[in-house]
Amino acid sequence: MAKKSKVAKELKRQQLVEQYAGIRRELKEKGDYEALSKLPRDSAPGRLHNRCMVTGRPRAYMRKFKMSRIAFRELAHKGQIPGVKKASW
């Protein structure tokens, strides 16, 4: 499980990105890179890192399910992810 402070920091970054998205888009269209550089660093979408919604793990993230491979495997074995079943051929 990831530290709660890291998960909270990532959530704060996500909120900042959403808050400044319109302003960033307008400044980029104008080409005003001076004003763009004065916005908070964490408002840049490139600073976001995907984290597992269950454990907060930053690595081995599966975008489709928004969780890490470890959490995915556990929940899939329990049958708690709709439409997912173990493959057999």
Curated annotation (Swiss-Prot):
The keyword rRNA-binding applies. GO terms for cellular component: cytoplasm; small ribosomal subunit. Keywords: Ribonucleoprotein, Ribosomal protein, RNA-binding, rRNA-binding. This is Small ribosomal subunit protein uS14A. Belongs to the universal ribosomal protein uS14 family. NCBIfam families: PRK08881.1. It comes from the Bacteria. SUPFAM superfamilies: Glucocorticoid receptor-like (DNA-binding domain). Binds 16S rRNA, required for the assembly of 30S particles and may also be responsible for determining the conformation of the 16S rRNA at the A site. Non-essential protein. A second form of uS14, it can integrate into the 30S subunit where it partially compensates for loss of the major uS14 protein (AC P12878) in restoring 70S formation, although it does not seem to be incorporated into the ribosome as well as the major uS14. Coiled coil: none annotated. The gene is rpsN2. The lineage of its organism: Bacteria, Bacillati, Bacillota, Bacilli, Bacillales.
